[in-house]
Amino acid sequence: MNRIFKTLALAAAITAMAVPAFAAESAPLHQTVKSPQKLEVKSAGNEHFTGEVVTAALYGPQAPSKSYAATVTFSPGARTYLHIHEMGQTLIVTEGTGWTQEWGKNPVMLKPGDIVRCPPGVKHWHGGSAKMSMTHIALSEAGGTVTWMEPVSDEDYPKD
């Protein structure tokens, strides 16, 4: 009987040591630093954007976190189509000037340092100004969908 208890105790101890080892493999237990020179910059395409837009992923979701971030640069006049984020979105303007607009409301000019918090379910668009490019960091959560809608027409786009 003692032998069974010793075997069970040993098995429990080995299991207890193994669990943290597996957890460490799923997420690094140290800080990571990524140089901007190593970011992959790519075109956002024209499926959901008007004008030239480029993106660079800063980081992806890593369990248990669901957050991810990217830089997005809009050339002058470039903008997103109207869209809705199921999980919401935060934008931090880092360069240039641009616009954001909730459906049915007046456009709001954006400048470096501005932080836009768009709650879940709010129909909106954002982009560069007519005369100047804009770069922002976009922060979102994985697991939610983005519902893309119609483009913002030249008539509805602010002319600075």
Residue ranges and their predicted role:
Residues M1-A9:
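Bacterial N-terminal signal peptides that target proteins for export
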Residues T80-L82, T100-Q101, K123-S129:
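Short beta-strand His + acidic residue motifs that chelate non-heme Fe in jelly-roll/DSBH
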Residues K131-E150:
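A short hydrophobic beta-strand segment most commonly corresponding to one strand
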Residues T71-S75, I84-T100, L139-E141:
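Short, conserved beta-strand element in jelly-roll/cupin
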Residues G104-G121:
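Short acidic-glycine-tyrosine-enriched beta hairpin
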Residues F22-K66, V146-D160:
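A short, N-terminal "cap"/entry segment at the start of jelly-roll beta-barrel domains
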Residues T15-F22:
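C-terminal segment of classical bacterial N-terminal signal peptides
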